[in-house]
Amino acid sequence: GLMVILRPSVYICAEWEFGGLPAWLLNEPMRLRSTDPRFMAKVRNYFQVLLPKLVPLQITHGGPVIMMQVENEYGSYGMEKAYLRQTKELMEEYGIDVPLFTSDGAWEEVLDAGTLIEDDVFVTGNFGSRSKENAAVMKEFMAKHGKNWPIMCMEYWDGWFNRWGEPIIKRDGQDLANEVKEMLAVGSLN
């Protein structure tokens, strides 16, 4: 069957409006993607409905879900490791027991800020070109923390953002094919 890497966490980005967060959160005075108790109460409310539905779908319970994401590209947004830890702990509290991961750009500053490598949460990267260079940065980051984990590109970007009123961004097909070939040679494309 199909194995699933699930990204159910609070902020998913995925180029969705407001990163998938509900817009009504802006009506309440709170700091988003932080340990602000008002925000974390909303996270708890979300998780207490969603996560019990996902527990039986984990591979540890006979389902297809092999991994779940704690946060997406947090290192490009904030540096509050306590927020990442609280999110991880809530996931575990509600029964998530498959390997957890974070996903960030492949440069040291955002990996430092957006990962929980020190808590053994798997590190993945997001990129769509310069695969050898990005994989080397990730490998060096992991080695610095005593990890010999596989390199994994969680989001392989085959295009880029289009904005209203601007020309459509197109990527050359041969360029994309060459980049994918390079990533496959590195050995880790999700």
Where are these regions (language model features)?
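Structured loop/turn residues at beta-strand edges in well-structured enzyme cores
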Residues: 63, 118, 186-187
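Structural motif
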Residues: 60, 115, 183-184
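Active-site beta-loop-alpha junctions enriched in small/polar residues
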Residues: 9-13, 70-75, 103-107, 126-130, ...
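Catalytic-core region of carbohydrate-active enzymes that cleave or remodel glycosidic bonds
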Residues: 2, 90-94, 130-190
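Active-site mouth of glycoside hydrolases
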Residues: 1-98
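Hydrophobic faces of well-ordered beta-strands that scaffold small-molecule active sites
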Residues: 4-8, 66-70, 100-102, 123-125, ...
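Substrate-binding cleft/loops of secretory-pathway carbohydrate-active enzymes
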Residues: 75-96, 104-142, 146, 168
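Short, hinge-like loop/turn segments at secondary-structure boundaries
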Residues: 21-26, 117-121, 170-171
